[in-house]
């Protein structure tokens, strides 16, 4: 029997918050325009007792700054809890030091970003991609959406892919243009996505959690001869990411009927060759 589709009217921030709530056990938050409503939705749902995909209520903790939120994400991930945060602009820049650590330790998580101009000679709260482009070198994979429906679909891809690949993701979309655009979209629900989680990868993530009964040393100092080899070994994880993302795009397409791919081609191809 075909499941009847459910539609809602929402903006991009609500779509991202809806998906992230499903896959998160902890949300470390700090408000910054135009991402603030994502955290507000998650806080509201947690207070109302809404259950995530694991049948639990998300633990929401507001920190003293975006840097504190990123540090809380890092610590929570090390403790074996799936964790997320929401930010933009200078707030994202404050998270960069922890992003290097999260990516370097292959901790699966998603940062949801409503991309916004960075303040320079003056403050500007409107959208561009200066903030997310400042994070390309951190080791986070990136997914970008251009519509509210894409936010709903691709946010799910980001959360599913990060669990399987261990590579953290920045999931971003244009501040205001998409974050506050209100559209009628198809809603993905817990039962749609629960079966797509790689349970073995999730169990392995939890087994790697810091535990006083099974102590390990992490973040030690290394000499260059070892350090560069360990950095090179990371490439195996990153090389696997495109195939994993495409796999989950295909799975979401099966549920929704909307095609998603790593590359979508539009228009005509013009080929010219020199005269003989």
Language-model features and meaning:
Residues 1-134, 139, 156, 175-176:
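Thiamine diphosphate
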Residues 6, 10, 28, 63, ...:
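Hydrophobic alpha-helical scaffolding
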Residues 15-17, 159, 259-265:
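Generic recognition of flexible, low-complexity loop/linker segments
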Residues 20-22, 266-270:
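Flexible, charged surface loops at secondary-structure boundaries
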Residues 54-58, 169-264:
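Conformationally flexible catalytic loops at phosphate/diphosphate-handling active centers
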Residues 125-175, 187:
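Conserved thiamine diphosphate
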Residues 271-276:
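Conserved small/polar residues in nucleotide/adenosyl-binding loops
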